[in-house]
Amino acid sequence: MSAATESAQEAQWRKWRSVADLYHAFFTGLILTVVTRRGTADAAEFVFRVFRRQQQERFLPGLKKLGLDGLPPAVAAAQYHYLSNWIGGVHVQYVYENDRKAWIRYPPPRWIWKGTAICGVPGEVSRAMLRGWHANNGVALGDLRLGFVCTKQSVDGQDGLEGYYCEYDHPLELDQRLVFARHLEAPPFDPNTAPALPVDSWPKPRLEKAYRNYAMEYVKTAAPVIVQVFGPEDASYLLHLTGKLIGMQYFDEVAQALGGSRGRATEFAEIGRASCRERV
């Protein structure tokens, strides 16, 4: 590859990452908008439905894409969270104990609650994320013995979101698929023993595109979900307000990455069009 081609490719990837950051900020901001305008209970319901829909649409296909579908259920679920989140730029750790118990940990700084946003997220909203996705992986795999034990929540002041998948000796009832055990702690993380993506099937260009798409998928899921939960009129207000706030806060940052600058409405519109082009 020539130096010019490599430089152009790096510039393209910077644009993709800027778009990813914008979508990331919008998704986090949307949750905070619902918390502050609708309250904790409504925000928890919204987050639950977003993550349940994501889980139903992406978990099983993702297992196959990552080559994890032949692993024991607890190991497959934990490795899925490790690899899929790693691709999206999330700080994440994985620890294998045995074929029926595997840990996953999201240490600070938390990706989803970036920066000071973490101070505005109630514990109930974080639990809704786990109920929506982690608690339902056993159901998706057809193994009702698989549950998730949460040992830490960063929004509660603990040093990360942490827990383990456990395959029990009996089928679990609905309220047993997510339980809390705050007295436990994950074993130390060893990156040398963690799973890794095969380089030949996951080259740099594919990883960069997946990084961009990771944040975009949350917004693509959240938009229709918020309409279903709150109705089109209230959803329109929440989406518009969040978009305006995030747009004002992130305009300079995104414009710089996309080769634009601060200006009047025409310049703002051009940055919007440039952002749309980088989503393709």
What are these regions (language model features)?
Residues M1-W103, R110-A128, V139, D143-G160, ...:
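N-terminal accessory segment detector
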Residues M129-W133:
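Elongated alpha-helical scaffolds
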